[in-house]
Amino acid sequence: MREVYIDNVSMTKFGRLDSSLRDLTTKAGEECIKNTDKKIDCLLIGAMNPEEFSSNSNISSLVADYLNIQGIPSLRIETASSSGAAIFSLGCSLISSGAYENILLVAAEKMSGLDTQKVTKILAKVIEENERLSGASMPSLAAMVTMAYKLKYKIDKELLNEIMRTIAIKNHHNGSLNPLAHFQKEISEKDYNNSKIISNPLKMYDCSPISDGATALILTSKKTDVRVSGSGQATDTVSLKNRISLSNFAATRLAAKKAYTASSLTPKDINFAEVHDAFTSFEAINTEDLGFFNEGESYLHILRGETSITGSLPINPSGGLKSRGHPVGATGLAQIIDCVYQMRNLVSHSRQVPNNQIALCHSIGGMGNNIFVNILEKASNKRSKQLLTSKINHELIPKINDSSEMINENEELEGRLASYTTLYVTPEGFDSPLTLGIIDTMKYKRIFARALFEGEFEIGGRITIFRENNIVYFRKTSYVDQIKFFARRNIKNILDFFE
């Protein structure tokens, strides 16, 4: 097995751009290969859904054609929003194995040609079918993870708001220093507090934007100044309700374990990191799952400023997905390129991290179900060199079996609310607001359902569940909701009779 190094890298500006997907991939690719002495012998493309976002298909061949390198093997890889990290991981394996010498990676997405509801609907296609048919979107599932995390670690509403606000303000500050970022302006506490709720408790400034952008990177077997020290990947259930824990990402923990093992490093060896902060709460959760902080204690370090650019462990000095932007297919590779910029001292003094020897990049595909962790290291770093991969025991993540479809039409049963959210920016075809919940039951274990009546719910509170017209609903067990439910059913029966 050979060591793998990073040669040239390039990235377009991220944002809502006039450029087409062809323009973006060509610009990033040409910039990357124009000054290299490496002969490219393979092309890997990362993109999540160019067919629907920008009406482009067969892009592995198209990009080879755009860059005038047709003739070499070209593949497109898709792992949802971690596609950029996926081509990096695969490229490392191909070079390490000796299959190729120099691989060009190009990752991109063009999303801004569609309205927000349409983009939300397309992104929701990575969600498990029953959850999606209930109206679930990525923000709503993220909100439920956040609520479960809040409950597990006994974080009150005010503290949770402070944690997420601090992360949002930090990442917007970092983005304001990044000339390639989608958002290049800072936000204030007032800006954050006054931003609209997307899916309770997530506000607009907790959510990453819809962005366009492209990235490119050359992996090589020839020694450069940055080597790949370790890489790990892990998957989890597509359905959120089937996971043993709703409050963290088991696949991040497993992917990180593999990357640390492969590199013979520990979390304490990492100098700075780019982590997947599609939602601000995820930055807090991810830094715990990656082993940087103890469970439930990341906020202590965040609020003390330890994750700022000048802190002891800078997190997302690029601005992260939150501020740099999130063109989904490009994001995973953008994180790696941002780390390379830092390691080569190619960023402004105000954005340069104090120690840039070893970096970790963490990318999430879907709602935490296809995750990559990559560790980069300066080749000059004085420690024993390690091979990219080592013998790792591949573990399976346990799950709770799906049981939503087992509920009979009009059957009623009781359970307790494990997590919930009220979604205000809904996917195309769903009315707003929409309350969604995950319910633990004795009979069917765990159910994903839609609230019949809007209102405030208590996590851990008793809930009644039933199926109607192939949709699973939940309601409170209170007398008021029972009366409303029977009144609704009687009115429906009367209307059905006259029809």
Go through the PLM ranges and name each one.
Residues 1, 5, 50-104, 110-141, ...:
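Conserved catalytic cysteine-centered active-site region
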Residues 1-22, 27, 124, 128-132, ...:
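Condensing-enzyme catalytic core mediating Claisen C-C bond formation in acyl metabolism
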Residues 1-82, 90, 149-160, 167, ...:
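Conserved active-site "lid/cap" helical segment
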Residues 51-58, 241-244, 277-300, 327, ...:
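Short glycine/threonine-rich loop-to-helix capping motif typified by GTGT followed
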Residues 78-109, 139-178, 217-222, 324-348:
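Active-site-proximal alpha-helical scaffold in enzymes
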Residues 380-423, 453, 457, 464, ...:
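OB/S1-fold single-stranded nucleic-acid-binding modules
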Residues 425-438:
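Short aromatic-glycine-enriched beta-strand elements
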Residues 444-456:
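Beta-strand/loop nucleic-acid-binding surfaces
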